[in-house]
Amino acid sequence: MECVLDVLVIGAGPTGLACAIEAMRSNLDVLVVEKGCLVNSIFSYPPGMTFFTTRERLEIGDIPFTTINVKPTRAEALEYYRGVARFYHVPVRYHERVVGIAGSDGNFEVRAAATDGDPKCYRTRKVIIATGYYDIPNLMGVPGEDLPKVSHYYGEAHAFYQRKVAVIGGANSAAIAALDLFRHSAEVTLIHREPELSRHIKYWVRPDIENRIKEGSIRACMATAVREITRDAVWVETAQGEPTRIENDYVFALTGYHPDFEFLRRVGVEIDPGTSRPNCNAKTRESNVPGVYLAGVVISGRHTNEIFIENGRFHGNQIIADIQKHPGARAPRPKETAGPPPLE
């Protein structure tokens, strides 16, 4: 008999790990498939980043998050989630991108591709998609956005010392990046299409960015739309319709991110055309495709400020409880083949 998993989780972020741990606690055979490294999105955050939330709200698997900081750093979070994965021996296939899901409830075939192009295939009864949203930036769709000097992810400020840097956006990421660049002696211009900064900026960040703008340390172009990015400038249009050239060396377009809607559509998940929210049962987290569940921020569509680690980490409880309700929740397996199916 061919080995069949009970549950395959796509994504080894905190939510995906929490789902896998809940499945393991319920004695289900589970495998996690991850396109990058463990908690890949957190790994991609700026090295000096501090979480906005407290450590207990990041905990999964009933493992305490011990740290000297009330609000953990990126490094502390990486260490914590490594420890959780190690404690539970969570089975993860790293650097494999899921490219398709075929079959039906109880008999899915999940196809993946390793970074070296080697194809993989897994059979599973249920699928949990916990792919997050950080991989796909909201593009502006302007000429020059694909230039090497443009990035949709902020890292460290040191390389931009005494350089002219434009930060596009008006939410937390843009505000924090602008402040960090300013404090490393970059010449910063903040460009935002709205007349005011986002109301979602954290209360301890807002006065800092507003005061730097007020004193002129950071130039702010509000109610301003980016029209083109060139090798040495950013062309914008003000609210009055005036084209303006801003001298520029580098651009951080921190305009937000969104889930992989195209992948969800290929799987068969319905996407609301207005909100981009996927069709998902709020109680069970099962999508309109029977046997395919959604967990974490992927549920929120473009409203990615609604679901975070602190609430997405509980989705696994709902999902596994629903899977366990159905007769034959555990897949039949030959005694000599414990654990996940072999790689193909």
Please state what every model-predicted region is.
Residues M1-I10, R25, N40, S44, ...:
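FAD-binding core/adjacent interface of flavoenzyme oxidoreductases
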Residues C19, I42, G103, N138-M140, ...:
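Short glycine-/acidic-enriched loop or helix-start segments at secondary-structure transitions
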